[in-house]
Amino acid sequence: KVYGRCELAAAMKRLGLDNFRGYSLGNWVCAAKFESNFNTHATNRNTDGSTDYGILQINSRWWCNDGRTPGSRNLCNIPCSALLSSDTIASVNCAKKIVSDGNGMNAWVAWRKRCKGTDVNAWTRGCRL
């Protein structure tokens, strides 16, 4: 599923991401835009053999099990395929673990490069939330 900006903001808010660990909803919507272009089915292979999955491009080396990443830690205790679900519940629940892990949203390269230090509130502006 490819979400609309406000549609995703509403879904993320409903799932408790607004101000989770101090990150406003705009941060999450911005991260999703630049990680997956709001597409829940996005997958991208990395040079180390791991793969990033779903709307927040969660990595199989650390966070989920895809059955083909050597030494996968699966810290979210889920199959990576769950991260491709159109309802985003698994992605959001795993993202909460990731952002609580010590590096905050810096765990997402796209957030660090494209969202951090910008006016992320623009990502939720005009949305009925």
Curated annotation (Swiss-Prot):
One of its GO terms (biological process) is defense response to Gram-negative bacterium. Disulfide bonds join 6-127, 30-115, 64-80, 76-94. This is Lysozyme C. Its EC number is 3.2.1.17. Its main location: secreted. Belongs to the glycosyl hydrolase 22 family. Lysozyme C is capable of both hydrolysis and transglycosylation; it also shows a slight esterase activity. It acts rapidly on both peptide-substituted and unsubstituted peptidoglycan, and slowly on chitin oligosaccharides. SUPFAM superfamilies: Lysozyme-like. GO terms for molecular function: lysozyme activity. One of its GO terms (cellular component) is extracellular region. The active site is at residues 35, 52. It is found in: Secreted. Signal peptide: none annotated. Residues 1-129 form the C-type lysozyme domain. Keywords: Antimicrobial, Bacteriolytic enzyme, Disulfide bond, Glycosidase, Hydrolase, Secreted. Monomer. Lysozymes have primarily a bacteriolytic function; those in tissues and body fluids are associated with the monocyte-macrophage system and enhance the activity of immunoagents. It catalyses: Hydrolysis of (1->4)-beta-linkages between N-acetylmuramic acid and N-acetyl-D-glucosamine residues in a peptidoglycan and between N-acetyl-D-glucosamine residues in chitodextrins. The keyword Secreted applies.
